[in-house]
Design a protein with these regions (language model features):
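C-terminal lobe/lid and adjacent interdomain/linker elements of RecA-like ASCE P-loop ATPase modules
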Residues: 2-4, 9, 15, 422-462
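Conserved P-loop NTP-binding catalytic core
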Residues: 135-196
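Hydrophobic positions in the central parallel beta-sheet of the AAA+
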Residues: 101, 405-408
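Phosphate-binding glycine-rich loops of NTP-binding sites
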Residues: 118-156, 371-386, 427
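Conserved ABC ATPase signature
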Residues: 325, 332-336, 340-404, 411-421
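Asp/Glu-rich intrinsically disordered low-complexity tracts
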Residues: 22-47, 51, 55-56, 60, ...
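Pre-Walker A-like glycine/lysine-rich segment at the N-terminus of P-loop NTPase domains
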Residues: 2, 12-15, 20, 71, ...
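Electropositive, glycine-dotted interaction segments
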Residues: 194-325
Length: 462
């Protein structure tokens, strides 16, 4: 799959990942010998010699090598000269956030890596993999929040590469990963998932600054565990223990690592940075057909489909006048006709409906608005609010000032005309610049916004 990256008016090509020519795979201290008896081959995609499968990144990998990411700097390599400050996170202050999404073998994607800025738009023709990239991000977020692998990947067969063939044990799977930057510097996470014959995580690697901090591998397929080893740097260089194969090990580390040594504290800091970067995610796809009717008064927290938009308007209008004024300005830019206010009315049966105040005594019910107007209004509200107003699961143990909310918007431009998309993108760029919110969206055509300041566009090709 070809990928190019555009930020403003500049474009660069992203080369496919692959190990440098002649460079042998690097292994870390404590790894088992390469031909260790009993190690199940992590060949989840079949025989690499099969027709049409040469070069599949899942082929021929062992438990210890499955997560090697061909291409970029090997996470098992020793830190290079001059990298010590970066490895210790000295030059990476700020809120934890994802800076790269890797789809080594996932659905249509092979060895793909997408750079993520504060506002990133994926664009490309139908079938280029925009939706699957967003699904991978959302799945990682669910795993980071402690969800089981079945909840994170509800449709596992769709995520297995189409041409992947089962191995001798009839296993197939996929592999994804990401990089989270923050106070600890870049932290890499790579996960290998077996989809067939049963769903389980068979390998995981967390690394930072050239050092492997956590590595798991499936040793005994008959048991629901993976063997985990995490960095200790004490009397023993690593600690080994079993972890469940239906949960992300990185999310479990704070419950398993005592933090007594410098090495353990480094592991905890990297794991916490990754989990915080992943957890606060809001997948939003406003459904106009569900937003038109009056809704029961509820929690005032916006759902992913924005069904309860009227209920949230009732809450937000009273809570923050400045934010509401910005929402009214956004509605004025995205809706036809004059807009003096956006509000909610309580009906006789106790339900709530949203209306636009036209300023001349006329109020237009949201049910009368077009699909594009409703989507523009709902997405504007999402960008102007925060985790307290959206149905998300933020890291409650982490101060809000250290968290970043990421909005995932598939089909961001669906139903929007070019002017509405420009207005919405401009609002998103202004909000994302503040650092408390980020947006990863998919659009069918980004030509009208690719030159907008603060907008990064990644072009996908089938």
């Amino acid at each position: 799959m070809g990928v190019s990256f555009v930020s403003g008016a500049d474009a660069v090509s992203l080369p496919r990942q692959g190990r440098r020519a002649g460079e042998p795979p690097v292994r870390c201290a404590g790894d088992p010998p390469e031909d260790r008896a009993g190690d199940p081959p992590e060949d989840l995609a079949g025989d690499p010699r099969s027709e049409g499968h040469a070069g599949d990144p899942l082929q021929g990998a062992r438990a210890g090598d499955l997560l090697l990411e061909p291409g970029a700097d090997d996470p098992l390599a020793e830190p290079r000269a001059g990298d010590s400050d970066t490895a210790r996170g000295a030059a990476h202050p700020g809120r934890p956030r994802l800076t790269e999404l890797r789809l080594s073998a996932f659905a249509r994607h092979r060895r793909a890596a997408f750079p993520l800025g504060p506002l990133t738009l994926l664009t490309g023709p139908s079938g280029s993999g925009k939706t699957s990239a967003l699904r991978a991000y959302e799945a990682l977020a669910r795993l980071g929040g402690g969800a089981g692998v079945g909840e994170a990947f509800p449709d596992t067969v769709a995520y297995v590469p189409e041409r992947a063939r089962p191995d001798a044990q009839r296993r197939r799977g996929f592999r994804i990963g990401c990089t989270a930057d923050g106070p600890e510097g870049p932290v890499r996470l790579d996960v290998a998932v077996q989809a067939e014959p049963e769903l389980r995580i068979v390998g995981e690697r967390l690394s930072a600054g050239g050092l492997v901090l956590l590595e798991t591998a499936l040793r005994d397929p008959s048991r629901p565990f993976v063997q985990a080893a995490w960095h200790t740097a004490g009397q023993s260089p690593v600690t080994r223990a079993p972890l469940p194969d239906d949960r992300l090990g990185t999310a479990l580390l704070p419950l398993r690592v005592a933090g007594k040594t410098d090495g353990q504290r480094r592991v905890l800091a990297a794991a916490e940075q990754m989990v915080v970067a992943l957890r606060s995610v809001f997948a939003c796809d406003p459904r106009p057909e569900r937003m038109r009717a009056a809704v029961p008064a509820g929690s005032g927290r916006l759902l992913g489909g924005c069904d309860n938009l009227a209920d949230v308007l009732w809450r937000t209008r009273a809570e923050c006048g400045q934010r509401h004024a910005l929402l009214v300005a956004a509605a004025r830019a995205g809706c036809a006709g004059p807009v003096a206010d956006v509000l909610a009315e309580v009906l006789a049966d106790g339900t709530v409906r949203g209306v636009l105040d036209r300023g001349d005594g006329v109020r237009t019910q949201l049910g009368r608005l077009g699909d594009g107007e409703l989507r523009h209004l709902a997405l504007s509200l999402v960008l102007l609010t925060g985790p307290g107003v959206l149905e998300v699961d933020p890291a409650g143990e982490v101060p809000e000032a250290m968290q970043t909310l990421t909005v995932l918007a598939d089909g961001l431009d669906r139903g929007l005309d070019p002017a509405q998309l420009r207005e919405l993108t401009g609002l998103a760029a202004r909000m994302c610049e503040r650092g408390h919110i980020r947006l990863l969206g998919a659009v069918s055509d980004a030509s009208g916004v690719s030159g907008t300041a603060g907008v990064s566009v990644v072009h996908l090709e089938p």
